[in-house]
């Protein structure tokens, strides 16, 4: 999947807007708001990615570099991939309303069976 520099800049601007409006980098921001922001970042990225690690690498590497230059850390390629994985596992934002931590959502996202994932969520 090829993406031009203008599209990358638009993605970058959209992500910056989300990070700043949700206070993602602020230590005082509640965890639920940070989780919502990560999900929203992934919702912006998902249409431009295929889910294929190799094909998505150039886009994620470019965005990661720009975001880390602006914010310091927290936007490495693995972090962006994690955001996408959680987004794909929980395509409806309402599915994130159970009060779990980001680490819980990451672990749940790795479960390929949707029904089992829901069962694990209820147990958590």
Identify what each model region corresponds to.
Residues 1-124:
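Basic, low-complexity intrinsically disordered segments
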């Amino acid at each position: 999947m090829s993406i031009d520099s203008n599209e990358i800049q638009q993605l970058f601007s959209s992500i910056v807007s989300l990070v700043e409006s949700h206070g993602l980098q602020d230590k005082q921001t509640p965890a639920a708001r940070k989780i919502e922001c990560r999900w929203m970042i992934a919702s912006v990225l998902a249409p431009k990615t295929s889910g294929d690690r190799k094909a998505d690498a150039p886009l994620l590497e470019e965005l990661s570099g720009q975001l880390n230059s602006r914010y310091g850390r927290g936007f490495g390629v693995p972090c962006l991939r994690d955001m996408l994985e959680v987004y794909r596992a929980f395509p409806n934002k309402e599915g994130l309303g159970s009060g779990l931590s980001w680490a819980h959502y990451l672990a749940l996202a790795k479960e390929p069976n949707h029904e089992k994932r829901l069962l694990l969520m209820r147990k958590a």
